[in-house]
Amino acid sequence: MKRLGGLALAALGVVFGDIGTSPLYAIRECFHGDYGIAINEANVFGVLSLLVWSLLLIVSLKYLTFIMKADNDGEGGILALTALLIRHCKKNGGSERFFLIAIGLFGAALLYGDGMITPAISVLSALEGVQMVAPAFHDLIIPATVTVLVILFLFQHHGTARVGTLFGPVILLWFVVLGVLGLVEILRYPQILQAFFPWHGIMFLLNNQLHGFMVLGAVFLSVTGAEALYADMGHFGKRPIRLTWAFLVLPALLLNYFGQGALLLDSPADAHHPFYGLVPSWGLIPMVILSTSATIIASQALITGVFSLTQQAIQLGYLPRLTVTHTSAKHMGQIYVPAANWSLMVATISLVIGFGSSSKLAAAYGVAVTATMLISTILFYYVARDLWRWNKSVLNVMIVVFLLVDLAFFGASASKLFHGAWFPLVIAAVMFTVMMTWKQGRGLLLKQLQDRTLTVEEFMSSLALQPPYRTNGQAVYLTANPDLVPLAMLHNLRHNKVLHSEVALFHFSTERVPRVPNNRKVEVVKLGDGFYKVVARYGFLEYPTIRQVLALANHQGLHFKPEAISFFLSREKIVAGVKSKMTIWRKKLFAVMSRNAISATSYYDLPPGQVIEIGLMVQI
Protein backbone atom coordinates (compact mmCIF):
# COMPACT_ATOMS: atom_id res chain seq x y z
CA MET A 1 0.00 0.00 0.00
CA LYS A 2 2.88 2.37 0.82
CA ARG A 3 4.46 1.65 -2.57
CA LEU A 4 1.11 2.21 -4.29
CA GLY A 5 0.77 5.59 -2.58
CA GLY A 6 4.29 6.58 -3.62
CA LEU A 7 3.63 5.62 -7.24
CA ALA A 8 0.33 7.50 -7.22
CA LEU A 9 2.03 10.65 -5.90
CA ALA A 10 4.83 10.35 -8.47
CA ALA A 11 2.27 9.78 -11.24
CA LEU A 12 0.56 13.03 -10.30
CA GLY A 13 3.56 15.11 -11.32
CA VAL A 14 4.35 13.28 -14.54
CA VAL A 15 1.10 11.83 -15.86
CA PHE A 16 -1.57 14.36 -14.90
CA GLY A 17 0.27 17.66 -15.33
CA ASP A 18 -1.04 18.29 -18.85
CA ILE A 19 -4.69 17.44 -18.28
CA GLY A 20 -4.50 19.09 -14.84
CA THR A 21 -3.58 22.51 -16.26
CA SER A 22 -6.41 22.52 -18.82
CA PRO A 23 -8.74 24.50 -16.48
CA LEU A 24 -6.49 27.50 -17.13
CA TYR A 25 -7.91 27.90 -20.64
CA ALA A 26 -10.58 25.30 -21.58
CA ILE A 27 -13.71 27.09 -20.27
CA ARG A 28 -12.35 30.47 -21.33
CA GLU A 29 -11.97 29.34 -24.94
CA CYS A 30 -15.55 28.05 -25.04
CA PHE A 31 -16.95 31.49 -24.20
CA HIS A 32 -14.19 33.95 -25.04
CA GLY A 33 -12.18 32.35 -27.86
CA ASP A 34 -12.47 32.79 -31.63
CA TYR A 35 -15.69 30.76 -31.67
CA GLY A 36 -16.88 31.74 -28.19
CA ILE A 37 -20.58 31.21 -27.50
CA ALA A 38 -22.90 33.65 -25.72
CA ILE A 39 -23.02 33.37 -21.92
CA ASN A 40 -26.45 32.27 -20.74
CA GLU A 41 -27.71 29.43 -18.57
CA ALA A 42 -28.48 27.05 -21.46
CA ASN A 43 -25.07 27.52 -23.04
CA VAL A 44 -23.13 27.26 -19.77
CA PHE A 45 -25.03 24.10 -18.80
CA GLY A 46 -24.52 22.70 -22.31
CA VAL A 47 -20.77 23.36 -22.43
CA LEU A 48 -20.25 21.92 -18.93
CA SER A 49 -22.27 18.84 -19.84
CA LEU A 50 -20.17 18.26 -22.97
CA LEU A 51 -17.01 18.79 -20.96
CA VAL A 52 -18.01 16.38 -18.18
CA TRP A 53 -19.01 13.62 -20.56
CA SER A 54 -15.88 14.14 -22.65
CA LEU A 55 -13.79 13.46 -19.53
CA LEU A 56 -15.89 10.41 -18.67
CA LEU A 57 -16.08 8.91 -22.17
CA ILE A 58 -12.59 9.70 -23.46
CA VAL A 59 -10.45 9.50 -20.33
CA SER A 60 -12.32 7.22 -17.90
CA LEU A 61 -13.89 4.83 -20.40
CA LYS A 62 -11.79 4.84 -23.56
CA TYR A 63 -8.28 5.29 -22.19
CA LEU A 64 -8.32 4.06 -18.58
CA THR A 65 -10.73 1.16 -19.14
CA PHE A 66 -9.94 -0.08 -22.64
CA ILE A 67 -6.84 1.32 -24.32
CA MET A 68 -4.66 0.79 -21.23
CA LYS A 69 -5.35 -2.94 -21.64
CA ALA A 70 -3.26 -2.82 -24.83
CA ASP A 71 0.19 -2.73 -23.25
CA ASN A 72 3.42 -3.91 -24.86
CA ASP A 73 4.99 -5.85 -21.97
CA GLY A 74 3.71 -3.16 -19.61
CA GLU A 75 4.61 -0.18 -21.81
CA GLY A 76 2.10 2.17 -23.40
CA GLY A 77 2.21 4.90 -26.02
CA ILE A 78 1.51 4.97 -29.71
CA LEU A 79 4.89 3.58 -30.84
CA ALA A 80 4.72 0.79 -28.27
CA LEU A 81 1.20 -0.02 -29.48
CA THR A 82 2.37 -0.05 -33.11
CA ALA A 83 5.33 -2.29 -32.24
CA LEU A 84 2.96 -4.66 -30.41
CA LEU A 85 0.79 -4.98 -33.51
CA ILE A 86 3.70 -5.51 -35.89
CA ARG A 87 5.21 -8.13 -33.57
CA HIS A 88 2.05 -10.20 -33.18
CA CYS A 89 0.07 -9.67 -36.37
CA LYS A 90 2.33 -11.69 -38.66
CA LYS A 91 -0.61 -12.72 -40.81
CA ASN A 92 -1.27 -9.16 -41.89
CA GLY A 93 -0.65 -8.64 -45.57
CA GLY A 94 1.87 -6.18 -46.90
CA SER A 95 -0.67 -3.40 -47.45
CA GLU A 96 -2.26 -3.77 -44.00
CA ARG A 97 1.14 -3.95 -42.32
CA PHE A 98 2.24 -0.78 -44.13
CA PHE A 99 -1.01 0.95 -43.11
CA LEU A 100 -0.46 0.12 -39.43
CA ILE A 101 3.16 1.28 -39.51
CA ALA A 102 2.22 4.46 -41.40
CA ILE A 103 -0.57 5.59 -39.09
CA GLY A 104 1.45 4.61 -36.01
CA LEU A 105 4.40 6.69 -37.21
CA PHE A 106 2.14 9.62 -38.10
CA GLY A 107 0.61 9.43 -34.62
CA ALA A 108 4.09 9.55 -33.12
CA ALA A 109 4.98 12.47 -35.41
CA LEU A 110 1.92 14.37 -34.14
CA LEU A 111 3.30 14.15 -30.60
CA TYR A 112 6.25 16.30 -31.65
CA GLY A 113 3.82 19.10 -32.51
CA ASP A 114 2.07 18.56 -29.19
CA GLY A 115 5.42 18.75 -27.40
CA MET A 116 6.05 22.15 -28.97
CA ILE A 117 2.63 23.66 -28.26
CA THR A 118 2.00 22.38 -24.71
CA PRO A 119 4.85 24.28 -22.99
CA ALA A 120 3.96 27.44 -24.92
CA ILE A 121 0.23 27.49 -24.16
CA SER A 122 0.58 26.22 -20.58
CA VAL A 123 3.21 28.69 -19.34
CA LEU A 124 1.68 31.57 -21.30
CA SER A 125 -1.82 30.96 -19.88
CA ALA A 126 -0.44 30.81 -16.33
CA LEU A 127 1.50 34.06 -16.61
CA GLU A 128 -1.45 35.84 -18.21
CA GLY A 129 -2.94 35.85 -14.73
CA VAL A 130 -0.50 38.64 -13.86
CA GLN A 131 -2.64 41.14 -15.76
CA MET A 132 -5.50 40.36 -13.39
CA VAL A 133 -3.37 41.88 -10.62
CA ALA A 134 -1.55 44.57 -12.57
CA PRO A 135 -2.88 45.31 -16.09
CA ALA A 136 0.16 47.52 -16.70
CA PHE A 137 2.31 44.36 -16.83
CA HIS A 138 0.51 43.11 -19.95
CA ASP A 139 3.47 43.88 -22.24
CA LEU A 140 5.82 41.87 -19.99
CA ILE A 141 3.88 38.59 -20.30
CA ILE A 142 5.59 37.46 -23.54
CA PRO A 143 9.15 38.26 -22.35
CA ALA A 144 8.43 36.56 -19.01
CA THR A 145 7.07 33.46 -20.78
CA VAL A 146 10.12 33.28 -23.06
CA THR A 147 12.42 33.63 -20.03
CA VAL A 148 10.69 30.79 -18.16
CA LEU A 149 10.83 28.54 -21.24
CA VAL A 150 14.52 29.27 -21.89
CA ILE A 151 15.37 28.38 -18.28
CA LEU A 152 13.24 25.22 -18.54
CA PHE A 153 15.06 23.98 -21.65
CA LEU A 154 18.51 25.02 -20.40
CA PHE A 155 18.08 22.84 -17.32
CA GLN A 156 17.06 19.71 -19.25
CA HIS A 157 20.57 18.27 -19.37
CA HIS A 158 20.62 18.11 -15.56
CA GLY A 159 17.68 15.69 -15.62
CA THR A 160 14.71 15.65 -13.25
CA ALA A 161 16.16 13.39 -10.57
CA ARG A 162 16.88 16.25 -8.15
CA VAL A 163 13.61 18.15 -8.53
CA GLY A 164 11.42 15.21 -9.49
CA THR A 165 10.50 14.52 -5.87
CA LEU A 166 8.86 17.97 -5.74
CA PHE A 167 6.66 17.38 -8.78
CA GLY A 168 4.14 15.14 -7.03
CA PRO A 169 3.57 17.37 -3.97
CA VAL A 170 3.27 20.53 -6.12
CA ILE A 171 0.70 18.95 -8.43
CA LEU A 172 -1.11 17.48 -5.40
CA LEU A 173 -1.40 21.01 -4.00
CA TRP A 174 -2.54 22.20 -7.42
CA PHE A 175 -5.41 19.70 -7.60
CA VAL A 176 -6.48 20.42 -4.02
CA VAL A 177 -6.58 24.16 -4.80
CA LEU A 178 -8.50 23.47 -8.03
CA GLY A 179 -11.15 21.54 -6.12
CA VAL A 180 -11.46 24.06 -3.27
CA LEU A 181 -11.77 27.07 -5.61
CA GLY A 182 -14.48 25.34 -7.61
CA LEU A 183 -16.36 24.08 -4.56
CA VAL A 184 -16.61 27.58 -3.06
CA GLU A 185 -18.30 28.90 -6.20
CA ILE A 186 -20.56 25.83 -6.52
CA LEU A 187 -21.86 26.41 -2.99
CA ARG A 188 -22.90 29.90 -4.08
CA TYR A 189 -24.72 28.59 -7.16
CA PRO A 190 -25.55 24.88 -6.59
CA GLN A 191 -27.94 24.79 -9.56
CA ILE A 192 -24.86 24.50 -11.77
CA LEU A 193 -24.68 20.78 -10.88
CA GLN A 194 -27.67 20.18 -13.17
CA ALA A 195 -25.17 20.45 -16.03
CA PHE A 196 -24.01 16.93 -15.16
CA PHE A 197 -26.98 15.49 -17.06
CA PRO A 198 -26.08 14.72 -20.71
CA TRP A 199 -29.23 16.17 -22.30
CA HIS A 200 -27.92 19.68 -21.69
CA GLY A 201 -24.99 18.91 -23.98
CA ILE A 202 -27.23 17.32 -26.60
CA MET A 203 -29.61 20.29 -26.59
CA PHE A 204 -26.64 22.68 -26.80
CA LEU A 205 -25.46 21.02 -30.03
CA LEU A 206 -28.98 20.89 -31.48
CA ASN A 207 -29.80 24.51 -30.65
CA ASN A 208 -26.47 26.02 -31.72
CA GLN A 209 -25.86 23.72 -34.71
CA LEU A 210 -22.65 24.74 -36.57
CA HIS A 211 -21.60 27.21 -33.88
CA GLY A 212 -22.08 24.54 -31.23
CA PHE A 213 -20.00 22.11 -33.29
CA MET A 214 -17.19 24.68 -33.51
CA VAL A 215 -17.20 25.05 -29.71
CA LEU A 216 -16.38 21.32 -29.46
CA GLY A 217 -12.83 22.26 -30.45
CA ALA A 218 -12.57 24.30 -27.24
CA VAL A 219 -14.33 21.65 -25.15
CA PHE A 220 -11.69 19.18 -26.29
CA LEU A 221 -8.97 21.23 -24.59
CA SER A 222 -10.17 19.69 -21.31
CA VAL A 223 -8.95 16.20 -22.34
CA THR A 224 -5.71 17.04 -24.17
CA GLY A 225 -3.56 15.18 -21.63
CA ALA A 226 -5.38 11.85 -21.96
CA GLU A 227 -2.75 10.32 -24.27
CA ALA A 228 -0.10 10.94 -21.58
CA LEU A 229 -1.97 8.60 -19.21
CA TYR A 230 -1.44 5.77 -21.68
CA ALA A 231 2.09 6.76 -22.73
CA ASP A 232 3.37 6.85 -19.11
CA MET A 233 1.74 3.59 -18.10
CA GLY A 234 5.07 1.74 -18.12
CA HIS A 235 6.61 4.09 -15.56
CA PHE A 236 3.90 3.87 -12.92
CA GLY A 237 1.57 0.99 -13.76
CA LYS A 238 -2.14 0.92 -14.54
CA ARG A 239 -3.49 0.75 -10.99
CA PRO A 240 -1.82 3.90 -9.56
CA ILE A 241 -2.90 5.92 -12.61
CA ARG A 242 -6.49 4.68 -12.46
CA LEU A 243 -6.81 5.22 -8.70
CA THR A 244 -5.27 8.69 -8.82
CA TRP A 245 -7.62 9.68 -11.62
CA ALA A 246 -10.75 8.35 -9.95
CA PHE A 247 -10.18 9.65 -6.42
CA LEU A 248 -8.31 12.93 -6.94
CA VAL A 249 -7.81 14.24 -10.45
CA LEU A 250 -11.30 13.76 -11.90
CA PRO A 251 -13.15 15.14 -8.82
CA ALA A 252 -10.82 18.17 -8.67
CA LEU A 253 -11.24 18.90 -12.38
CA LEU A 254 -15.03 18.57 -12.25
CA LEU A 255 -15.29 20.82 -9.20
CA ASN A 256 -13.16 23.49 -10.87
CA TYR A 257 -15.00 23.37 -14.19
CA PHE A 258 -18.39 23.55 -12.47
CA GLY A 259 -17.06 26.39 -10.32
CA GLN A 260 -16.01 28.32 -13.42
CA GLY A 261 -19.45 27.73 -14.93
CA ALA A 262 -21.14 29.05 -11.79
CA LEU A 263 -18.87 32.11 -11.87
CA LEU A 264 -19.81 32.88 -15.47
CA LEU A 265 -23.52 32.82 -14.65
CA ASP A 266 -22.94 35.07 -11.67
CA SER A 267 -20.38 37.36 -13.34
CA PRO A 268 -20.27 37.12 -17.19
CA ALA A 269 -17.60 39.84 -17.26
CA ASP A 270 -15.08 37.24 -16.02
CA ALA A 271 -15.30 35.33 -19.32
CA HIS A 272 -11.88 36.64 -20.38
CA HIS A 273 -10.28 34.55 -17.61
CA PRO A 274 -12.80 32.58 -15.50
CA PHE A 275 -10.08 30.48 -13.87
CA TYR A 276 -8.46 33.44 -12.16
CA GLY A 277 -11.92 34.86 -11.52
CA LEU A 278 -12.39 32.06 -8.95
CA VAL A 279 -9.37 33.31 -6.99
CA PRO A 280 -9.86 35.99 -4.29
CA SER A 281 -7.84 39.15 -4.93
CA TRP A 282 -5.45 38.43 -2.05
CA GLY A 283 -4.58 35.04 -3.57
CA LEU A 284 -3.89 36.08 -7.16
CA ILE A 285 -0.11 36.40 -6.87
CA PRO A 286 0.32 33.03 -5.03
CA MET A 287 -2.03 31.47 -7.60
CA VAL A 288 0.01 32.78 -10.54
CA ILE A 289 3.13 31.30 -8.91
CA LEU A 290 1.41 27.94 -8.31
CA SER A 291 -0.07 27.93 -11.84
CA THR A 292 3.31 28.68 -13.39
CA SER A 293 4.90 25.88 -11.34
CA ALA A 294 2.18 23.44 -12.42
CA THR A 295 2.55 24.38 -16.09
CA ILE A 296 6.34 24.02 -15.92
CA ILE A 297 5.87 20.52 -14.50
CA ALA A 298 3.30 19.72 -17.21
CA SER A 299 5.72 21.02 -19.84
CA GLN A 300 8.54 18.95 -18.34
CA ALA A 301 6.44 15.81 -18.71
CA LEU A 302 5.81 16.58 -22.40
CA ILE A 303 9.48 17.35 -23.06
CA THR A 304 10.56 14.12 -21.34
CA GLY A 305 7.93 12.31 -23.43
CA VAL A 306 9.46 13.68 -26.63
CA PHE A 307 12.91 12.50 -25.48
CA SER A 308 11.52 9.02 -24.81
CA LEU A 309 9.67 8.96 -28.14
CA THR A 310 12.86 9.97 -29.97
CA GLN A 311 14.84 7.19 -28.28
CA GLN A 312 12.18 4.63 -29.21
CA ALA A 313 12.18 5.83 -32.84
CA ILE A 314 15.99 5.54 -32.99
CA GLN A 315 15.96 2.03 -31.54
CA LEU A 316 13.18 0.90 -33.89
CA GLY A 317 15.10 2.26 -36.88
CA TYR A 318 12.90 5.24 -37.77
CA LEU A 319 15.40 7.98 -36.90
CA PRO A 320 19.19 8.21 -37.30
CA ARG A 321 21.40 7.71 -34.27
CA LEU A 322 21.39 10.82 -32.07
CA THR A 323 23.22 11.64 -28.86
CA VAL A 324 21.23 10.22 -25.93
CA THR A 325 22.48 11.05 -22.42
CA HIS A 326 21.25 9.25 -19.31
CA THR A 327 20.66 11.79 -16.54
CA SER A 328 20.10 9.26 -13.75
CA ALA A 329 22.14 6.25 -12.68
CA LYS A 330 19.06 4.70 -11.04
CA HIS A 331 16.32 5.28 -13.62
CA MET A 332 17.04 4.23 -17.21
CA GLY A 333 13.98 6.14 -18.45
CA GLN A 334 15.46 9.53 -17.51
CA ILE A 335 17.29 10.64 -20.63
CA TYR A 336 18.29 13.82 -22.42
CA VAL A 337 18.39 14.19 -26.21
CA PRO A 338 20.16 17.48 -27.08
CA ALA A 339 18.93 17.65 -30.70
CA ALA A 340 15.30 17.23 -29.62
CA ASN A 341 15.71 19.67 -26.72
CA TRP A 342 17.08 22.57 -28.78
CA SER A 343 14.58 21.97 -31.60
CA LEU A 344 11.71 22.05 -29.10
CA MET A 345 13.06 25.21 -27.48
CA VAL A 346 13.32 27.13 -30.76
CA ALA A 347 9.87 25.97 -31.90
CA THR A 348 8.17 26.67 -28.55
CA ILE A 349 9.61 30.18 -28.19
CA SER A 350 8.71 30.92 -31.82
CA LEU A 351 5.12 29.88 -31.10
CA VAL A 352 4.91 32.17 -28.07
CA ILE A 353 6.23 35.15 -30.02
CA GLY A 354 4.31 34.34 -33.21
CA PHE A 355 0.87 33.72 -31.68
CA GLY A 356 1.20 36.17 -28.80
CA SER A 357 -1.49 34.78 -26.49
CA SER A 358 -2.69 31.45 -25.13
CA SER A 359 -6.11 32.08 -26.69
CA LYS A 360 -4.62 32.20 -30.19
CA LEU A 361 -2.45 29.16 -29.44
CA ALA A 362 -5.53 27.19 -28.38
CA ALA A 363 -6.62 27.04 -32.02
CA ALA A 364 -3.40 25.19 -32.88
CA TYR A 365 -3.51 22.89 -29.89
CA GLY A 366 -6.40 20.52 -30.32
CA VAL A 367 -5.92 19.14 -33.81
CA ALA A 368 -2.67 17.26 -33.07
CA VAL A 369 -4.13 15.56 -30.00
CA THR A 370 -7.46 14.69 -31.64
CA ALA A 371 -5.64 13.11 -34.58
CA THR A 372 -3.43 11.11 -32.19
CA MET A 373 -6.49 9.88 -30.29
CA LEU A 374 -8.17 8.91 -33.56
CA ILE A 375 -5.11 6.87 -34.54
CA SER A 376 -4.97 5.23 -31.09
CA THR A 377 -8.60 4.13 -31.52
CA ILE A 378 -7.80 2.56 -34.91
CA LEU A 379 -4.73 0.74 -33.58
CA PHE A 380 -6.70 -0.47 -30.55
CA TYR A 381 -9.30 -1.94 -32.91
CA TYR A 382 -6.64 -4.08 -34.60
CA VAL A 383 -5.27 -5.23 -31.23
CA ALA A 384 -8.72 -6.21 -29.96
CA ARG A 385 -9.61 -7.94 -33.24
CA ASP A 386 -6.36 -9.75 -34.06
CA LEU A 387 -4.70 -10.33 -30.67
CA TRP A 388 -7.57 -10.64 -28.22
CA ARG A 389 -10.18 -12.07 -30.65
CA TRP A 390 -12.98 -9.99 -29.16
CA ASN A 391 -16.54 -10.55 -30.33
CA LYS A 392 -16.68 -8.62 -33.61
CA SER A 393 -20.21 -7.29 -33.16
CA VAL A 394 -19.49 -5.87 -29.70
CA LEU A 395 -16.11 -4.54 -30.81
CA ASN A 396 -17.54 -2.86 -33.90
CA VAL A 397 -20.24 -1.07 -31.90
CA MET A 398 -17.71 0.14 -29.33
CA ILE A 399 -15.23 1.33 -31.96
CA VAL A 400 -17.94 3.14 -33.93
CA VAL A 401 -18.91 5.07 -30.77
CA PHE A 402 -15.28 5.98 -30.05
CA LEU A 403 -14.66 6.95 -33.68
CA LEU A 404 -17.75 9.17 -33.80
CA VAL A 405 -16.55 11.03 -30.71
CA ASP A 406 -12.98 11.28 -32.05
CA LEU A 407 -14.12 12.44 -35.49
CA ALA A 408 -16.44 15.06 -34.01
CA PHE A 409 -13.61 16.56 -31.99
CA PHE A 410 -11.16 16.26 -34.88
CA GLY A 411 -13.57 18.00 -37.24
CA ALA A 412 -14.18 20.82 -34.77
CA SER A 413 -10.43 21.27 -34.19
CA ALA A 414 -9.60 21.05 -37.91
CA SER A 415 -12.10 23.83 -38.62
CA LYS A 416 -9.47 26.16 -37.14
CA LEU A 417 -6.98 25.14 -39.82
CA PHE A 418 -6.25 28.71 -40.90
CA HIS A 419 -6.18 30.00 -37.32
CA GLY A 420 -3.11 27.96 -36.35
CA ALA A 421 -4.25 24.32 -36.55
CA TRP A 422 -2.01 23.93 -39.62
CA PHE A 423 1.13 24.15 -37.48
CA PRO A 424 1.09 20.75 -35.71
CA LEU A 425 -0.04 19.08 -38.95
CA VAL A 426 2.95 20.55 -40.82
CA ILE A 427 5.31 19.45 -38.03
CA ALA A 428 3.78 15.96 -38.11
CA ALA A 429 4.10 15.77 -41.90
CA VAL A 430 7.77 16.80 -41.72
CA MET A 431 8.59 14.29 -38.96
CA PHE A 432 6.64 11.52 -40.72
CA THR A 433 8.57 12.19 -43.95
CA VAL A 434 11.87 12.15 -42.06
CA MET A 435 11.07 8.84 -40.33
CA MET A 436 9.79 7.10 -43.46
CA THR A 437 12.75 8.38 -45.50
CA TRP A 438 15.24 7.09 -42.94
CA LYS A 439 13.54 3.69 -42.70
CA GLN A 440 13.35 3.24 -46.48
CA GLY A 441 16.85 4.62 -47.02
CA ARG A 442 18.35 2.23 -44.47
CA GLY A 443 16.54 -0.63 -46.17
CA LEU A 444 17.97 0.31 -49.58
CA LEU A 445 21.43 0.81 -48.06
CA LEU A 446 21.44 -2.60 -46.39
CA LYS A 447 20.24 -4.21 -49.62
CA GLN A 448 23.18 -2.65 -51.49
CA LEU A 449 25.63 -3.83 -48.81
CA GLN A 450 24.18 -7.35 -48.82
CA ASP A 451 24.64 -7.63 -52.58
CA ARG A 452 28.37 -6.88 -52.19
CA THR A 453 29.25 -9.34 -49.43
CA LEU A 454 29.24 -13.05 -48.56
CA THR A 455 27.25 -15.14 -46.16
CA VAL A 456 29.06 -16.27 -43.03
CA GLU A 457 28.98 -19.88 -44.29
CA GLU A 458 30.51 -18.91 -47.65
CA PHE A 459 33.21 -16.89 -45.91
CA MET A 460 34.15 -19.72 -43.53
CA SER A 461 34.39 -22.14 -46.46
CA SER A 462 36.66 -19.74 -48.38
CA LEU A 463 38.95 -19.43 -45.34
CA ALA A 464 39.41 -23.19 -45.29
CA LEU A 465 40.54 -23.11 -48.94
CA GLN A 466 42.77 -20.01 -48.67
CA PRO A 467 43.58 -19.31 -45.01
CA PRO A 468 44.93 -15.76 -44.49
CA TYR A 469 47.75 -14.79 -42.17
CA ARG A 470 46.47 -14.55 -38.56
CA THR A 471 48.02 -12.13 -36.07
CA ASN A 472 47.62 -12.43 -32.32
CA GLY A 473 44.81 -10.28 -31.00
CA GLN A 474 41.07 -9.86 -30.75
CA ALA A 475 38.86 -8.02 -33.25
CA VAL A 476 35.18 -7.11 -33.20
CA TYR A 477 33.34 -6.23 -36.42
CA LEU A 478 29.88 -4.67 -36.20
CA THR A 479 27.44 -6.07 -38.75
CA ALA A 480 23.92 -5.03 -39.73
CA ASN A 481 23.01 -8.63 -40.63
CA PRO A 482 24.16 -11.53 -38.42
CA ASP A 483 24.16 -13.94 -41.37
CA LEU A 484 26.40 -11.80 -43.59
CA VAL A 485 30.07 -10.85 -43.33
CA PRO A 486 30.51 -7.09 -42.79
CA LEU A 487 32.15 -5.29 -45.70
CA ALA A 488 34.64 -3.74 -43.27
CA MET A 489 36.12 -7.21 -42.70
CA LEU A 490 36.26 -8.06 -46.41
CA HIS A 491 37.95 -4.73 -47.19
CA ASN A 492 40.42 -5.18 -44.34
CA LEU A 493 41.28 -8.68 -45.54
CA ARG A 494 41.58 -7.56 -49.18
CA HIS A 495 43.91 -4.66 -48.43
CA ASN A 496 45.90 -5.89 -45.41
CA LYS A 497 45.86 -9.65 -46.13
CA VAL A 498 45.56 -10.42 -42.41
CA LEU A 499 42.99 -11.26 -39.74
CA HIS A 500 43.20 -11.39 -35.96
CA SER A 501 43.49 -14.76 -34.25
CA GLU A 502 40.10 -14.20 -32.59
CA VAL A 503 37.30 -12.46 -34.49
CA ALA A 504 33.74 -11.78 -33.35
CA LEU A 505 30.91 -10.50 -35.57
CA PHE A 506 28.62 -8.36 -33.42
CA HIS A 507 25.02 -7.68 -34.40
CA PHE A 508 22.72 -5.40 -32.36
CA SER A 509 19.04 -6.21 -32.81
CA THR A 510 16.20 -4.07 -31.46
CA GLU A 511 13.22 -6.23 -30.55
CA ARG A 512 9.64 -4.92 -30.66
CA VAL A 513 9.37 -5.20 -26.88
CA PRO A 514 10.35 -2.56 -24.28
CA ARG A 515 13.04 -4.66 -22.59
CA VAL A 516 14.81 -7.98 -23.10
CA PRO A 517 15.84 -9.92 -19.95
CA ASN A 518 19.58 -10.43 -19.48
CA ASN A 519 19.34 -14.20 -19.88
CA ARG A 520 18.05 -13.70 -23.45
CA LYS A 521 19.98 -10.57 -24.29
CA VAL A 522 23.13 -12.09 -25.80
CA GLU A 523 23.64 -15.20 -27.92
CA VAL A 524 27.14 -16.43 -28.81
CA VAL A 525 27.69 -18.88 -31.67
CA LYS A 526 31.13 -20.48 -32.12
CA LEU A 527 31.89 -20.68 -35.85
CA GLY A 528 35.25 -22.41 -35.45
CA ASP A 529 38.83 -21.39 -36.21
CA GLY A 530 38.66 -18.51 -33.72
CA PHE A 531 35.49 -16.96 -35.20
CA TYR A 532 32.36 -16.11 -33.22
CA LYS A 533 28.98 -14.64 -34.01
CA VAL A 534 27.37 -12.54 -31.26
CA VAL A 535 23.75 -11.36 -31.46
CA ALA A 536 22.77 -8.77 -28.83
CA ARG A 537 19.02 -8.25 -28.44
CA TYR A 538 17.68 -5.09 -26.82
CA GLY A 539 14.24 -3.63 -26.26
CA PHE A 540 13.23 -0.29 -27.75
CA LEU A 541 13.48 1.37 -24.33
CA GLU A 542 16.99 0.09 -23.66
CA TYR A 543 20.34 1.61 -24.51
CA PRO A 544 22.95 -0.89 -25.79
CA THR A 545 26.59 -0.60 -24.75
CA ILE A 546 29.51 -2.74 -25.84
CA ARG A 547 30.77 -3.32 -22.30
CA GLN A 548 27.48 -4.83 -21.17
CA VAL A 549 27.38 -7.12 -24.21
CA LEU A 550 30.96 -8.28 -23.64
CA ALA A 551 30.20 -8.96 -19.97
CA LEU A 552 27.15 -11.07 -20.84
CA ALA A 553 28.98 -12.83 -23.70
CA ASN A 554 31.80 -13.76 -21.32
CA HIS A 555 29.40 -16.16 -19.56
CA GLN A 556 28.87 -17.94 -22.89
CA GLY A 557 32.50 -18.59 -23.71
CA LEU A 558 33.55 -15.37 -25.45
CA HIS A 559 36.55 -14.33 -23.37
CA PHE A 560 37.41 -11.01 -25.01
CA LYS A 561 39.15 -8.35 -22.95
CA PRO A 562 37.61 -4.89 -23.59
CA GLU A 563 40.95 -3.08 -23.35
CA ALA A 564 42.60 -5.44 -25.89
CA ILE A 565 39.96 -5.42 -28.64
CA SER A 566 40.27 -3.68 -32.00
CA PHE A 567 36.82 -2.55 -33.19
CA PHE A 568 36.27 -2.36 -36.96
CA LEU A 569 33.40 -0.30 -38.38
CA SER A 570 32.31 0.70 -41.85
CA ARG A 571 31.54 4.36 -42.56
CA GLU A 572 29.25 4.62 -45.59
CA LYS A 573 29.27 7.62 -47.89
CA ILE A 574 25.84 7.83 -49.50
CA VAL A 575 25.54 8.94 -53.11
CA ALA A 576 22.32 9.17 -55.14
CA GLY A 577 22.04 6.46 -57.78
CA VAL A 578 20.26 6.75 -61.11
CA LYS A 579 17.69 4.03 -60.53
CA SER A 580 15.97 3.86 -57.16
CA LYS A 581 12.58 3.62 -55.49
CA MET A 582 13.28 6.92 -53.71
CA THR A 583 12.87 10.35 -55.27
CA ILE A 584 16.00 12.45 -55.64
CA TRP A 585 15.06 14.90 -52.85
CA ARG A 586 14.48 12.03 -50.42
CA LYS A 587 17.85 10.51 -51.37
CA LYS A 588 19.50 13.83 -50.56
CA LEU A 589 17.57 14.05 -47.28
CA PHE A 590 18.71 10.54 -46.35
CA ALA A 591 22.32 11.40 -47.23
CA VAL A 592 22.18 14.51 -45.02
CA MET A 593 20.75 12.49 -42.11
CA SER A 594 23.41 9.81 -42.57
CA ARG A 595 26.21 12.38 -42.45
CA ASN A 596 24.81 13.98 -39.31
CA ALA A 597 24.03 10.77 -37.41
CA ILE A 598 26.41 10.15 -34.53
CA SER A 599 28.94 7.39 -35.12
CA ALA A 600 28.54 3.84 -33.91
CA THR A 601 31.58 4.54 -31.73
CA SER A 602 29.65 7.09 -29.68
CA TYR A 603 26.31 5.30 -29.80
CA TYR A 604 27.57 1.93 -28.57
CA ASP A 605 30.13 3.54 -26.23
CA LEU A 606 33.15 2.02 -27.97
CA PRO A 607 36.59 3.14 -26.73
CA PRO A 608 37.61 5.70 -29.43
CA GLY A 609 41.30 4.79 -29.30
CA GLN A 610 40.51 1.20 -30.28
CA VAL A 611 38.25 1.89 -33.28
CA ILE A 612 39.22 1.58 -36.95
CA GLU A 613 36.72 2.94 -39.49
CA ILE A 614 36.80 1.75 -43.11
CA GLY A 615 35.12 4.00 -45.67
CA LEU A 616 32.65 2.68 -48.24
CA MET A 617 30.81 4.46 -51.05
CA VAL A 618 27.25 3.22 -51.56
CA GLN A 619 24.69 4.21 -54.18
CA ILE A 620 20.99 4.17 -53.31
Curated annotation (Swiss-Prot):
Pfam families: K_trans, K_trans_C
Annotated catalysed reactions: K(+)(in) + H(+)(in) = K(+)(out) + H(+)(out)
Domain of life: Bacteria
Biological function: Transport of potassium into the cell. Likely operates as a K(+):H(+) symporter.
Keywords from the UniProt entry: Cell inner membrane, Cell membrane, Ion transport, Membrane, Potassium, Potassium transport, Symport, Transmembrane, Transmembrane helix, Transport
Keyword hit for Lipid biosynthesis: no
Principal location listed in the UniProt entry: membrane
Transmembrane parts of this sequence: 7-27, 44-64, 98-118, 135-155, 166-186, 201-221, 245-265, 278-298, 335-355, 361-381, 394-414, 417-437
Membrane topology: Multi-pass membrane protein
GO molecular function, one term: potassium ion transmembrane transporter activity
UniProt similarity note: Belongs to the HAK/KUP transporter (TC 2.A.72) family.
Protein name: Probable potassium transport system protein Kup
Keyword Cytoplasm: no
Database matches in InterPro entries: K+_transporter (IPR003855), K_trans_C (IPR053952), K_trans_N (IPR053951), Kup (IPR023051)
Subcellular location: Cell inner membrane
Source organism phylogeny: Bacteria, Pseudomonadati, Chlorobiota, Chlorobiia, Chlorobiales
Cellular component GO terms held in the UniProt record: plasma membrane
